[in-house]
């Protein structure tokens, strides 16, 4: 999987590019099932301690972050030698009042490099009703 020139230009101009379909619907469903199984093992909700750096806890997620279909587009944007600094589960049900205020990931995280990419993988439909992600160009 690679980005076309229009997608690369959009990223350079706007700071984001989406959607990039990297996993099949069946693979996404398997990821969701794995997450839901982990939630059930934890009593119905994934504990906060399991929601960050989750690729260190769940082999299936570690496999996703190492998948060439995920890494190749990122490499096109920031170059090789990619480090996955964090993975986060932001689990938000429809009509939930939880939110994340506007922010810039690179500034928010306090990392020293400007070669930072957020690769967001939706495991459920992203709709207005459940507070889908919004991006601001630039």
PLM regions: where:
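Non-heme Fe(II)-dependent double-stranded beta-helix
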Residues: 1-111
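Catalytic core of non-heme Fe(II) oxygenases with the double-stranded beta-helix
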Residues: 98-138
């Amino acid at each position: 999987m690679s980005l076309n020139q229009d997608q690369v230009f959009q990223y350079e101009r706007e700071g984001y590019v989406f959607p990039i379909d990297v996993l099949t619907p069946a693979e996404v469903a398997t990821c969701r099932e794995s997450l839901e199984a982990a939630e059930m093992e934890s009593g119905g909700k994934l504990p906060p301690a399991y929601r960050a750096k989750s690729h260190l806890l769940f082999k299936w997620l570690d496999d996703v972050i190492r998948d060439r279909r995920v890494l190749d587009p990122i490499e096109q944007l920031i170059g090789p030698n990619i480090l996955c600094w964090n993975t986060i589960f932001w689990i938000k049900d429809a009509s939930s009042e939880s939110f994340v205020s506007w922010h810039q990931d690179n500034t928010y995280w306090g990392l020293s490099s400007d070669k930072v990419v957020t690769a967001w993988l939706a495991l459920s439909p992203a709709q207005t009703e459940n507070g889908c992600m919004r991006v601001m160009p630039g």
